[in-house]
Amino acid sequence: MERVLLNKVRYLVEQLHWDVTVVTTDQHGREPFYPFPEGVGMIDLDVNYSDDNGKPFLKKLLGFLRRRRLHEKRLKALLNEIKPDIVDCFYPGECSFVPGLKDGSRKVMELHQSKLFHHQYNRSGLMGLADKVRAKMDEKLVRKFDRFVVLTEEDAQMWGEIPGLKVIPNAAKFIAERFSDGSAKRVIAVGRLDYQKGFDRLIEAWRIVQQNKAYADWHLDIFGQGEWKEMLQKMIDERGLQNCVRLNEPTKSIGKEYAESSMLVMSSNYEGFPMVMIEAMACGLPAVSFDFKCGPKDIIRHGVNGLLVKNGNIQGLADAMMTLMGDEALRKQMSLEARLVTETYSEEKVMGKWVSLFTAHR
């Protein structure tokens, strides 16, 4: 998400010379992981929702309500001070109260998840009911914005007739300095170590792969951090995969890691738009992915630049990986096709859509 924001801000500031202010809530004095261009206003409201993580449910709920009131108060004061033309907010954050702030700006909401993401956990009981209620509340919320932006045509169809609904994908700002030649016996996966990314499913699929001695010299590298790290490492150890599966910390040199791999695998339960897939394919990696909602159908041409697998089919994911692992010529052919994804998602095309949206009816 931070890279997506950075790319958009950089274009608006460096190419169009717009005044841009980035407002955050939980920086705790930390610098952004990726440096923003000089001249960008960086303001942290010091709300710090994350300070309540790990607390008992009731304390966490009361803390959230208190911090939300503080968030609204401080953001309202800031907007009345700087008087922006446009307020572009990322769900969830401040989206619940931004439409009600009367500062004279046009309000834009970006959703970087699919419409179904509240339902992805398939929870039952009170938590399942809460998920359904939140989904219904979202349907009412998005109608309050001047523009509502989703990332894929598939997601837009699920939202239906929403006033101001626009589809703008993320741009392939990533510039590949090196390209994969498809010869390395290495598979890569990138993302947070949590439920959404589904790396537990990938590890199970890799266990199946490793039962075939023909692929005993292949390795899987997962790059990311998150609350599932300990659990995933335990899975790796219990399945005897510690010599062929590694959990790696995030790196700012991910392009180098892509270039030294032969395919990307995505095992997510859901996404808004898989930016990792775009970046890896820009480096020449064919993508093997579950057909989760949303994104893979928009990006992967099955059998051309990657392989799609029915979501949740662990055996199918293993088979798809082995199809590419066992055919270097096919990997190299798909690698060339994968690199063409940058044409569809070029920064010029995508940012042209954003500029049109921001400048309409000014």
Where are these predicted regions, by residue range?
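A conserved mid-protein helix/loop that constitutes part of the nucleotide-sugar donor-binding site
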Residues: 2-7, 185, 189-210, 227-233
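N-terminal strand-loop element at the rim of the active site
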Residues: 11, 16-62
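Membrane-proximal helix-turn-helix segments that form the acceptor-binding/catalytic region
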Residues: 73-77, 128-148
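Short His-centered aromatic/hydrophobic patch
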Residues: 89-94, 111
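Carbohydrate-associated surface elements
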Residues: 154, 171
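Aromatic "clamp/platform" in nucleotide-sugar-dependent glycosyltransferases that forms part
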Residues: 250, 269
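Short hydrophobic beta-strand element within catalytic cores of glycosyltransferases
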Residues: 286-290
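Conserved acidic donor-binding segment of nucleotide-sugar-dependent glycosyltransferases
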Residues: 301-303, 307-314, 322-328, 343
